[in-house]
Amino acid sequence: MPKQIHEIKDFLLTARRKDAKSVKIKKNKDNVKFKVRCSRYLYTLVITDKEKADKLKQSLPPGLAVKELK
């Protein structure tokens, strides 16, 4: 079941949870979507700024499996 997160802070807190399994990064021409899989929901954060997306990618937790999609 999907849920959308609108704040970067909330997304980082969700990514640090112990039930967070993996992060998928989908890049389109106008935005970047970060999808974090937790036990119950798939949380999505949509960012339109490419620089913010790069910074967020750097600040993801190191133990999380990160997969980049086209």
From Swiss-Prot:
Keyword Nucleotide-binding: no
Pfam assignment, any one: Ribosomal_L38e
GO cellular component, one term: cytosolic large ribosomal subunit
MF terms in GO: structural constituent of ribosome
This protein's record includes keyword Nucleotide-binding: no
Signal sequence annotation: none
Keywords (A to Z) from UniProt: Ribonucleoprotein, Ribosomal protein
A single GO BP: protein-RNA complex assembly
Similarity remark: Belongs to the eukaryotic ribosomal protein eL38 family.
PANTHER family found in the cross-reference section: 60S RIBOSOMAL PROTEIN L38, LARGE RIBOSOMAL SUBUNIT PROTEIN EL38
Name of the protein in its database record: Large ribosomal subunit protein eL38
Species annotation: Branchiostoma belcheri (Amphioxus)
